[in-house]
C-alpha cells in the first residue's frame, strides 16, 4: 500500500488533547533553555516521555509552522487615506516581504485588499503581526486565508 501524504489542519488550541498541548510546552522549555533534557522538560509539564516522542515531530506552534512560508492575508478596511499604507509599513517593519497586493475599488466606504507576504525573514510571529494589523485605525478585519 502506497504511503499517503500527510494532511495538515489549523486548529484552535482549546480543542487539542492535553498530551499534545503539553508536548508543545515541553518543546518550548527545551527551545528556551528552561529545561536541558527531554526528561527535565516532560517532568516540568507532567507528561510521559512516550507521549512526548509520539507527538514532538508532528505538532508546532503556528508561528514556527508559518516561518518561511508565503501567507495570504485578506483585509477589510474603511475607505480613508493611509490605512493600506500603514498596514504595508507594519509588515515592512517586521521584515515581511510583500509579494503581491490586490486591492478592489471601495464600495460603501469599505475596501478589500489581499496581500501575499513572504515570512522567512520576519522578526515577529504571524499571530502577533495579525493582531497588530487588526488594531490599525481603519482596519475592520484581517484574516489569514492561505499559505504556500
From Swiss-Prot:
Coiled coil: none annotated. Residues 72-147 form the ACT domain. PROSITE patterns: ACT. InterPro entries: ACT-like_dom_sf, ACT_dom, UPF0735_ACT_dom-cont. It comes from the Bacteria. Belongs to the UPF0735 family. This is UPF0735 ACT domain-containing protein Dred_1164. It comes from Desulforamulus reducens (strain ATCC BAA-1160 / DSM 100696 / MI-1) (Desulfotomaculum reducens). The lineage of its organism: Bacteria, Bacillati, Bacillota, Clostridia, Eubacteriales.
